[in-house]
From Swiss-Prot:
The gene is Epsti1. The keyword Coiled coil applies. This is Epithelial-stromal interaction protein 1. Residues 43-58, 232-267 have a biased composition (Basic and acidic residues). InterPro entries: EPSTI1.
């Protein structure tokens, strides 16, 4: 094994220990030079191979390889570092805190201590009422918001109900129009049938004399049961239609009579109510007139209102 020894190449300068302890400069340098010589002497018998490696910037001594520093690069790095330090110092000088210049003033405000304490006491006394006012204001704001929301919902529901009402009204109008058309068509059909029956009946009534004479001559043909049944079958729809028309007319007349009777009753009721109102007013005015007179009821001999319908005697 190679002996362990401290080796410092030429140009590396002092080691880290020499930088930390600058007081032991010469003694440390002598020790380093002696150790370097011993290492070189030990490395010489190794042969020509180590001599070839020692040429140039690299030099191998035992287990260590010494590399000489690049002076140009080192100087460049140092120059850049110095420039940056100078820039930093310049920036610090430019951006250092400036002195503050304030106008001197009297501290403590323009009020005395007694006034301040009195103001604090008043604020303390009013704080309870101020908190109550704040709570009331918050409650009022919340109620206003709730009322606005309720009104908005009511408006929405009202709009929905209006739309539904319009839809129902439209359906009702369509239904009434359909019913009216159906009624008109049925009425026209009934009238056309009645006109047809009337024309047929008039044609039957206006028969030729030969037919009438044959009827008198051939009474057996008129008494034929098959012809009688067919004639009855033809007359039955006409009778039903006539009955329906008669019932409809009777219903209209009855409704008109009921409406007229109701109007008369309403007029009589209104007249009775008006007469009663007049009677009560006259009685009240008579009582007021009797109270305003000096003798009152005694001067009138017990009959204080002979003209009014509400008069009475003692």
């Amino acid at each position: 094994m190679y002996p362990r020894s401290r080796v410092v190449g030429p140009g590396l300068g002092t080691s880290s220990s020499s930088r930390d302890h600058a007081g032991a400069g010469q003694h440390g340098e002598l020790d380093l030079q002696q150790n370097q010589r011993q290492n070189l002497e030990v490395a010489e018998p190794k042969g020509p191979k180590l001599e070839r490696q020692g040429h140039g910037d690299q030099r191998s001594t035992g287990t260590y390889t010494l590399i000489a520093p690049n002076e140009t690069r080192r100087q460049k790095i140092q120059r850049i570092a110095e420039q940056e330090l100078a820039d930093l110092e310049r920036w610090k000088q430019q951006n250092k805190a400036k002195p503050v210049h304030l106008v001197p003033q009297r501290l403590g405000g323009s009020q005395s201590e007694a006034e301040v304490r009195q103001k604090q006491q008043l604020q303390q006394m009013r704080s309870k009422y101020q908190q109550k006012l704040k709570r009331d204001e918050a409650i009022r704001i919340r109620k206003d918001a709730e009322e606005a929301e309720l009104q908005r919902m009511k408006a929405i529901q009202r709009e929905k109900s209006n739309k539904l009402e319009k839809k129902k009204q439209l359906q009702e109008d369509i239904r009434r129009a359909t019913l009216r058309e159906h009624h008109q068509s049925k009425t026209a059909e009934l009238l056309s049938r009645l006109d047809t029956d009337r024309t047929n009946r008039s044609a039957c009534n206006i028969a030729p004399p030969a037919a009438q004479s044959s009827r008198w001559k051939l009474p057996v043909l008129l008494r034929d049961p098959s012809r009688a049944g067919s004639q009855a079958h033809k007359d039955s729809p006409q009778k039903e239609d006539n009955q329906k028309l008669q019932k409809t007319r009777d219903g209209h007349q009855k409704n008109k009579l009921l409406e007229t009777k109701g109007q008369h009753q309403e007029e009589e009721r209104a007249q009775i109510h008006q007469a009663e109102h007049w009677r009560v007013n006259n009685a009240f005015l008579d009582r007021l007139q009797g109270k305003s007179q000096p003798g009152g009821v005694e001067q009138s001999g017990g009959c204080w209102n002979m003209n009014s319908t509400d008069g009475w005697g003692i």
